Amino acid sequence: MKKATIITVAFLLLAAATIFFANRKRGEWIEEKRFQMATVTKIVIPRTKNSGTIIQEAFAAIDEVERAASRFIPESEINSLNDGQWHKLSPVLLPMWEKARELYELSGGRFDPTAGKLISLWGFGPEGIKKEPTAEEIEEALRLTGLDKVETSNDFIRLPKGMRLDLNSLAAGYAADRAAAVLKKHGLTKFLVDAGGEIVCASPGKKIWDIGIKDPESENETSVISLYNGAVSTSGSYANFYKSGSNSVTHIVDARTGKAAKTSLLSVSVVARDGIAADGLSTMLFCLPPEEGKKFPANAMFIEEVGGKLKTTKTGEWENLEKWRAKQDSNLRPTD
């Protein structure tokens, strides 16, 4: 799992601040879970005569993203792209590729979707061999890393033979978006989709979703934010790492150097209009030097360890979201 867990999801009535899940009427909502994308996914919708069928269709949309983008499924679309030939990207994979290219440019190349070989080399790919690579191994993998080496033409793409795409930093958020699109298609205006901590939610009127963000050093919440409509994602070095001697090796790799990211950051959380933006931005901001990331125009919370103590920095509208002053999309200024 790429993500730090986002916990304590509750539906609140703003005026009374009543925790809906603690006091909900029996049978008013349906909540189902699945194991998908190597994590637990959850969908919460109002109970109707068609809710069972609708929720299954939404889970199927998540399956579709996994079949397209998972490097852990040998026959997935993304694994078919490494033969050096031209391929037409499917309507499922194409939006992820386009968002990844955008984040590559915004990050100055630190966020690079072509870093699949590096990610595997450091032990976080399908091979699962967790060891620090040699300088020679890193140099070899870097020769097959770099979005500037990829050829594109409209919806077609050609990678150098042996290059590996990795869109894991976008896939869960995008899967939540696809599931949410199914729910909206069926006329639902109140719902929550949780794809392993990548949350997309919607609610009309004064009812809001209350979402707690996990403290990197405990099981408590370090922040609780409120949303009418939008998405939230957290990337963290503490959620997926291994020890190599005295070093902690994180799953987030700097594609420019080929080395696992070394940073004071423990987590970055982002609120955006949709899941793919929140998911990708939380990873991109984690890849940037902390002071550079904090200047980026996003609704974000950075938690880092400085001098043995935790330091929290909130940007954009984060503090307003914490104070229950959730705003409609037109006022929230979400990052696309």
What are these regions (language model features)?
Residues 2-329, 336:
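Mature catalytic core of soluble alpha/beta enzymes
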